[in-house]
Amino acid sequence: MASTFTATSSIGSMVAPNGHKSDKKLISKLSSSSFGRRQSVCPRPRRSSSAIVCAAKELHFNKDGTTIRRLQAGVNKLADLVGVTLGPKGRNVVLESKYGSPRIVNDGVTVAREVELEDPVENIGAKLVRQAAAKTNDLAGDGTTTSVVLAQGFIAEGVKVVAAGANPVLITRGIEKTAKALVTELKKMSKEVEDSELADVAAVSAGNNDEIGNMIAEAMSKVGRKGVVTLEEGKSAENNLYVVEGMQFDRGYISPYFVTDSEKMSVEFDNCKLLLVDKKITNARDLVGVLEDAIRGGYPILIIAEDIEQEALATLVVNKLRGTLKIAALRAPGFGERKSQYLDDIAILTGATVIREEVGLSLDKAGKEVLGNASKVVLTKETSTIVGDGSTQDAVKKRVTQIKNLIEQAEQDYEKEKLNERIAKLSGGVAVIQVGAQTETELKEKKLRVEDALNATKAAVEEGIVVGGGCTLLRLASKVDAIKATLDNDEEKVGADIVKRALSYPLKLIAKNAGVNGSVVSEKVLSNDNVKFGYNAATGKYEDLMAAGIIDPTKVVRCCLEHAASVAKTFLMSDCVVVEIKEPEPVPVGNPMDNSGYGY
């Protein structure tokens, strides 16, 4: 088998570090040693004798307050740009694209990522507040614009106080303590989301789009709250929803070199084959037969094993990077006996055979007959989703029945919980929402809205819901006075007052985007003691927002508050900025033949 592998030019040539095909001497060496030594895959670079040149830096001290003002100018430019998208009557932002048509977006974090300011100090300020949006997007998937606006409020109110001579260390400590206490109050205001409210949560996040809200709620009802819902770009102008058999688990790719989409940092394969191995893969030679079949068949292959040792992994990575194989690998989910059970579940879903030595199957003799089939595979750094091709539904039903019998026999609650998780992964399937639009530009913008709505719905399922429209943050401001009594000194209490004033910024901006005076709206909302009472910017009415379906996920509001406070703390504690001095661009050298009498 080793000789077959090395003789195959598509794989055997991968071992040679200089990129040329292996000669006979190299093949003979490989046949007598372990395949693909580390130094042959990743040769050690020669030590360079050239000196490292460091770019000069420019220092900006905040002696007269100009540096902080420039940082704040960057914050305000980014926040004002992102802020136009906030609320049901927020507008879109058009982003220039160097290649292709311009992008029209209504998503805060997408806009924030595109901003690069010419002034280096202002650009650092924009980058600081961008962190609030990015972190909120990572954890909650929605609320990015609110995070930026709230951070702008914290910074604006904080800069005024610090400029007046307050101690920024104690001020930021007060902000931190107040934000932490308000998170506790927020959880008290939260309620568990009902099935009938899921559509409202999604619709609000999608800019009051009821069609998107109802579709996401329908998807949740089909696969369950813990089911998996994914998005695809459709080929028609209409949105579509369908459910296919699938499974998701908390294991990501072993190496980032397997990534096929560098923007999302994910691996995506269609019509993929799966190799399941219930042991550690130590030698790449054992995979020769399976890999050669994959090359001849031209299909992508996913390897799921207990682990893959470094030398074998390096061989797979090099083959992938050179385009020889469409391949990815991940560690099997679970540990011990549960790991074997998960592998069996995946095998039944995909029609694969698990390679186990105790049943007489060895990896080096395995062929394509042991491979499973998946219509789609998506791997990220932390999760993996496998969508079956629908040909194993009868086997899946039998497997679910077996697991239900095990639940009846189980004595411990933990064991029952894990068995129920396996049933959900097997029988819940994957709901796929195909987003349709008339043009590519509209499709990109619409997909971002649906993605935000889906993330908001998942966040609502996790931690519950609160009143939306910026009213919950405004109501939290009334809790600050009680929190101030627990703080240690007057300057920390000033920090609490900063939080209190900043909490009204999102509601005021929502009202402003709807063409209404934000201060008037804020006062009218607070004049009513009913916590559900607020301003519906979509209709222009003051009403019970919970009954009107204006709902925010608690997790989103919590992340906005925590991350905005964190960014403000970092900003207010800054007193000096270091930036690189931009080197002047070289003047293009003219043609020495011009005007010499010899040119034409």
UniProtKB/Swiss-Prot annotation:
The gene is CPN60B1. The keyword ATP-binding applies. GO terms for molecular function: ATP binding; ATP-dependent protein folding chaperone; mRNA binding; protein domain specific binding. HAMAP family: CH60 (MF_00600). The keyword Metal-binding does not apply. Keywords: ATP-binding, Chaperone, Chloroplast, Nucleotide-binding, Phosphoprotein, Plastid, Transit peptide. This is Chaperonin 60 subunit beta 1, chloroplastic. The modification Phosphoserine is found at residues 101, 478. One of its GO terms (cellular component) is chloroplast stroma. It is found in: Plastid, Chloroplast stroma. Residues 1-23 are annotated as: Disordered. It comes from Arabidopsis thaliana. Its main location: plastid.
